[in-house]
From Swiss-Prot:
Entry similarity comment: Belongs to the GPAT/DAPAT family.
Enzyme category, top tier: transferase
Compartments, record wording: Cell inner membrane
Motif residue range(s): HXXXXD motif: 305-310
SMART domains linked: PlsC
Name this protein carries in UniProt: Glycerol-3-phosphate acyltransferase
C-alpha cells in the first residue's frame, strides 16, 4: 500500500469511528461459513471505496479474520489482500469496469494456482450495505449502486450507524483454477459473478420497493376478480355498486399493512433493549439456508409454530439481524387494538378475520391482496397452527392460508415459492400461566392495552430464546411430484380449487408441521421438566436429576433426531444450574443433599415445556417402556410392537421417520441404551440393568400418558365396535378426565378432544376401522392388548372400573 493511502486511511479512521457503526452478517463467519484461517484469504468488494475498506477492516479484526489492509505474500512478493470488482464513480465518472490492479491480482493468484497444485486461496465476497431502506413504488434504481465522494458523505451522515458488513460464502480459487482455467477471461467472469451476487445480497436485505398504499387499493379495486365480485354482491343485495365498492375499500383498509422502514429501524433498538432485558441470549440456527433462498430470488413464506405473542416481534427481529427483510405477517384481527394495532401494521402486519366463510367479498379481497404480496416479491409469514398452542405441543395445521398460497401460485407466479418452517422456543413463555387458567376452563381474555401493560410489568429475565429455521419446502417441487399437471389449473382471474387441491394442501401441511418439529431446540428447562414430571412426587435429588439430564443429552447427541434439531453444548451440571436460576423449582436441603421438585401449580406449567420436546424422546421412551414392562424381551419383539404403535405417535407428534427407516432408528436407540448401561444385551435378548433401573424408568415414563390415552380409546372400541367418531372422542375424553383426577395426571392435553380426534383418524387410515367406521376387532384387540401390557396395574384397574360402570 502506498504511503499516501496509509496517511489517507489514518485521517479517515477518526471520523469513521464516530460516524459508522456496523453489524456483521453472519455474526460468526469463521464457523458459519467454514472459513479456514490456515489458508490464504483475499477479500472482494463491489466498488473501489476506502470508506468501505476501512469499515471492513474494523469488522474483520473484531471477528478474528485477517486484516484486509495487511498484505498477502505470493511467491515472496507482497500484494493487497483485497480486490474491487468495479472502479466506482469518481466525481464526474460512472465507469464500472474491473480495475486494472484487481485484474492483475486475479491473474497472479490464478497463475499461482496453476503452477502450485497445493495452493488453495479463499476469495471472500464482502459488501458494505449503507442502510437497508427499500425504495418506493414507481422509482427505479439499481440494488447496489456505487457512490462518489459527496454521495458517500451524505450516506455516512444518514446511514453510517445503520450499516451492515455482509460476508458471503467462500469461493475456492483452487476450484476455479481447476475447473475454469487461469486466463484473463476467468478473472472477468469472477468479477461479474461477484457483482450479481452483491446485487442479490442488497435486494435480499432491503426487499422490493414498498407500494403506495392508495395506489395498491386502486389497483386491487380494478382487478377483474374483485370487480366481478363487487358487481355480483351489488346485484344479489340490490344495492348501489358504489356502496359495495366503498365497503371493499374499507375491507382493504382493515387488512393491508402500512410497512415503515423507519419503524423497523427504530423498533430494532427498542427490541434489542427488550431482548437483553428479557433473555440471557437468543440462539439462532440455520439462518444461512434462508439467506441463500432470498438471494436466489425465492418467494419465501415463513411458517413458524406459535407459542406466544412475542413470536411476532422475535422472528422479525431475528430476520432483520440476519440481513433479511422482515416479512409481511398475517395477524389475527384481535390484535388490531390501539395502540398495538397501528404499530404492528407499520411493522409489517396485515390483519385477518378469524372466520370469513360465506363472505365472498372479504375472501376475494384477502386472496387478491395475498396474491399481490407474492407477485411483488414480499416475504410473508403466517402461523402454521393458526393460534397459540396452550399445551406446548404442536397443534394440527390450519390449512386456510396454505391453500390460498397454493391458489396464488395458480395465478401464474413466475418465481419459486418456498415454505420455511420455523421452530420458536423459550425457557419462559410469558402467557404460560394464562394458558393454564384457560385450560382449566377460564374464558380467554380479549387482547387489549391493559393486558399489554400488565405483561410489561412482569418483564424479567426469562432465560434463553430459540429460533431454529427448519428444512425448506419447495411448493413447486411438491406440486410437480404430487400433482404433475398442476400448471394446467393456472387461471389469473378465478380462484381455482381443482380435485387435487385438498389432499395436496393437507400433505404439505403435514410436511410443514413435521419440519417444524424436526427443528426443535432442547434446552435446560425443557429437559429438566421432562425428568421431573417423570418422577414420583415430581421430585428428584440434585444428583439423580443431573444423571437423568446426562442420559437425555447422550441420547440426543449420539442418536440425533434430525439435521435441524439442536442440543445444548453445556454439560448436565451447567444446564441444571442454569435451570435452577430461572426460579421455577422448589429447592429443599436435608442432611443428604438437595432435592429439586415441582409444586402442584408448577407441575401443570412444566408440562408446557416438556411438550415442546416430547417428540424427541418418543421412540427411546417407548423402547424403555417395553423393556421395563417385559423384564426380558427380544429386539425382534420390540421392533414388532413399535411398528404397530409408531403410526399413532407419528400422526400425533409429527415424527419424521418413514416406515422403511424405522427399524434402523430403533436399533440405533437400543444400541445407545445399551451403551449407557440402561439395558443389558445378550445376543438378541434385552433385559433390565438393575444398577440403572431408575434412569430407565424415568425415560420410560415420558411416553406413559400417550399410551394411556390409546388404551382408553381402544378399550372403548373393543367394548363398542360400532362407536362413531364423536361418541368415541366424547367417551374417551370423559374417561381420560377421570384418570387424570384419580391418578394425579396434570398434563392438560391428556384429555384434549383434539388428540382423540387425531387418534380416530389414524385408526381409520391404518385399517383399524372399516369403511363404515366400525372397529375391525381382529386388528384392534391385539393392539389393545399390547398397549394394555405397558400400563401400570393401577391405571388398568381404573379403566376397567370405568368401563364396568358404563356397562
Amino acid at each position: 500500500m502506498s504511503t499516501g493511502h496509509t496517511i489517507y486511511h489514518s485521517l479517515l479512521k477518526l471520523p469513521l469511528s464516530v460516524m459508522v457503526k456496523s453489524s456483521s452478517i453472519p455474526s460468526n463467519p469463521i464457523e458459519d461459513l467454514n472459513i479456514d484461517l490456515e489458508r490464504p484469504i483475499i477479500y472482494a468488494l463491489p466498488f473501489r471505496s476506502h470508506v468501505d475498506l476501512l469499515t471492513l477492516q474494523k469488522s474483520a479484526l473484531e471477528l478474528g479474520l485477517p486484516d484486509p489492509l495487511s498484505p498477502i505474500e505470493i511467491e515472496g512478493v507482497k500484494y493487497p489482500r483485497y480486490v474491487f470488482t468495479s472502479i466506482g464513480p469518481k466525481m464526474f465518472d460512472t465507469d464500472d469496469d474491473l480495475p486494472q490492479e484487481s485484474l492483475d491480482l486475479f491473474k497472479i493468484v490464478l497463475k499461482h494456482h496453476a503452477d502450485n497444485p497445493d495452493a488453495d486461496f479463499q476469495l471472500i465476497p464482502t459488501s458494505i450495505l449503507w442502510g437497508r431502506k427499500p425504495g418506493k413504488e414507481g422509482t427505479s434504481k439499481p440494488h447496489l449502486m456505487p457512490l462518489n465522494g459527496p454521495q458517500k458523505f451524505v450516506t455516512l451522515i444518514k446511514a453510517g450507524r445503520d450499516s451492515t458488513v455482509r460476508i458471503s460464502p467462500v469461493v475456492s480459487l483452487r476450484y476455479m483454477a481447476d475447473n475454469h482455467g487461469s486466463d484473463e477471461a476467468i478473472a472477468h467472469k469472477l468479477a461479474r459473478v461477484a457483482k450479481i451476487h452483491f446485487s442479490r445480497q442488497k435486494l435480499a436485505a432491503s426487499g422490493p420497493n414498498l407500494p403506495n398504499r392508495q395506489a395498491l387499493f386502486n389497483r386491487l379495486l380494478k382487478s377483474q376478480a374483485i370487480e366481478k365480485v363487487i358487481l355480483e354482491e351489488a346485484k344479489s343485495r340490490n344495492v348501489d355498486v358504489e356502496k359495495v365498492r366503498k365497503e371493499a375499500m374499507g375491507i382493504m383498509e382493515e387488512i393491508a399493512t402500512n410497512f415503515s422502514y423507519s419503524l423497523i429501524k427504530n423498533g430494532n433498538r427498542i427490541l434489542k433493549w427488550l431482548w437483553n432485558r428479557l433473555y440471557q441470549g437468543l440462539n439462532i440456527n440455520n439462518a444461512s439456508t434462508v439467506r441463500k433462498l432470498a438471494q436466489e430470488g425465492h418467494e419465501i413464506v415463513y411458517v413458524p409454530c406459535h407459542r406466544s405473542h412475542m413470536d411476532y416481534l422475535l422472528l422479525s427481529y431475528v430476520l432483520y439481524h440476519e440481513g433479511l427483510v422482515p416479512p409481511h405477517i398475517a395477524a389475527g384481527i384481535n390484535l388490531n387494538f390501539f395502540p398495538a394495532g397501528p404499530i404492528f401494521r407499520r411493522g409489517g402486519a396485515f390483519f385477518i378475520r378469524r372466520s370469513f366463510k360465506g363472505n365472498r367479498l372479504y375472501s376475494t379481497i384477502f386472496r387478491e391482496y395475498l396474491a399481490e404480496l407474492f407477485a411483488k416479491g414480499y416475504s410473508v409469514e403466517y402461523f402454521s397452527e393458526g393460534g397459540r398452542s396452550r399445551t406446548g405441543r404442536l397443534l394440527q395445521a390450519k390449512t386456510g392460508m396454505l391453500a390460498m398460497t397454493v391458489q396464488a401460485m395458480l395465478r401464474g407466479l413466475n418465481r419459486p415459492v418456498t415454505l420455511v418452517p420455523v421452530y420458536i422456543g423459550y425457557e419462559h413463555v410469558m402467557e404460560v400461566t394464562t394458558y393454564a387458567k384457560e385450560l382449566r376452563g377460564k374464558r380467554k381474555e380479549k387482547e387489549n392495552a391493559g393486558q399489554v401493560l400488565r405483561t410489561l410489568r412482569k418483564l424479567r429475565n426469562f432465560g434463553q430464546g430459540y429460533v431454529n429455521f427448519g428444512e425448506p419446502i419447495s411448493l413447486n417441487h411438491y406440486l410437480n411430484e404430487h400433482a404433475p399437471n398442476w400448471s394446467e389449473s393456472i387461471n389469473p382471474i378465478e380462484p381455482q380449487k381443482p380435485e387435487w387441491m385438498t389432499p395436496v394442501v393437507n400433505g404439505i401441511a403435514n410436511k410443514m408441521m413435521t419440519h417444524i418439529n424436526d427443528a426443535a431446540a432442547a434446552n435446560a428447562l425443557t429437559l429438566c421438566a421432562t425428568a421431573l414430571l417423570a418422577a414420583n412426587q415430581r421430585a428428584l435429588s440434585k444428583e439423580d436429576l443431573t444423571e437423568q439430564l446426562d442420559c437425555y443429552l447422550q441420547i440426543l447427541r449420539n442418536v440425533p433426531y434430525s439435521a435441524t434439531a439442536t442440543v445444548p453444548s453445556e454439560d448436565a451440571d451447567a444446564l441444571l444450574e442454569h435451570a435452577i436460576k430461572l426460579d421455577k423449582f422448589v429447592i429443599e436441603k436435608d442432611t443428604l443433599g438437595e432435592i429439586v421438585s415441582l409444586d402442584r401449580n408448577q407441575s401443570l406449567l412444566m408440562t408446557y415445556y416438556r411438550n415442546n420436546i416430547i417428540h424427541l424422546f418418543a421412540l427411546p421412551s417407548l423402547i424403555a417402556k417395553l423393556v421395563v414392562h417385559h423384564d426380558t424381551i427380544t429386539v425382534e419383539q420390540i421392533q414388532e410392537q413399535i411398528k404397530l404403535i409408531y403410526p399413532f405417535l407419528k400422526a400425533e407428534l409429527f415424527l419424521h421417520y418413514e416406515e422403511d427407516e424405522l427399524a434402523s432408528i430403533v436399533n440405533n436407540h437400543i444400541d445407545e441404551l445399551v451403551q449407557q448401561n440402561l439395558i443389558l444385551r445378550d445376543g438378541d435378548t434385552l433385559q433390565l440393568c438393575n444398577a440403572n433401573i431408575r434412569k430407565l424408568h424415568l425415560l420410560a415414563h415420558t411416553i406413559s400418558e400417550t399410551l394411556q390415552r390409546y388404551a382408553i380409546a381402544l378399550t372403548h372400541l373393543q367394548a363398542s365396535p360400532d362407536l362413531g367418531k364423536d361418541e368415541l372422542e366424547e367417551q374417551s375424553q370423559i374417561m381420560a378426565q377421570r384418570l387424570s383426577r384419580l391418578h394425579g395426571i396434570n398434563a392438560p392435553e391428556f384429555f384434549d378432544k383434539g388428540v382423540f380426534c387425531i387418534l380416530f383418524n389414524t385408526l381409520k387410515t391404518e385399517g383399524y376401522l372399516d369403511e363404515d367406521g366400525a372397529a375391525v376387532l381382529s386388528k384392534v384387540e391385539p393392539l389393545s392388548q399390547d398397549i394394555a401390557h405397558l400400563l401400570t396395574p393401577e391405571i388398568k384397574l381404573t379403566i376397567h372400573a370405568v368401563m364396568t360402570k358404563e356397562d
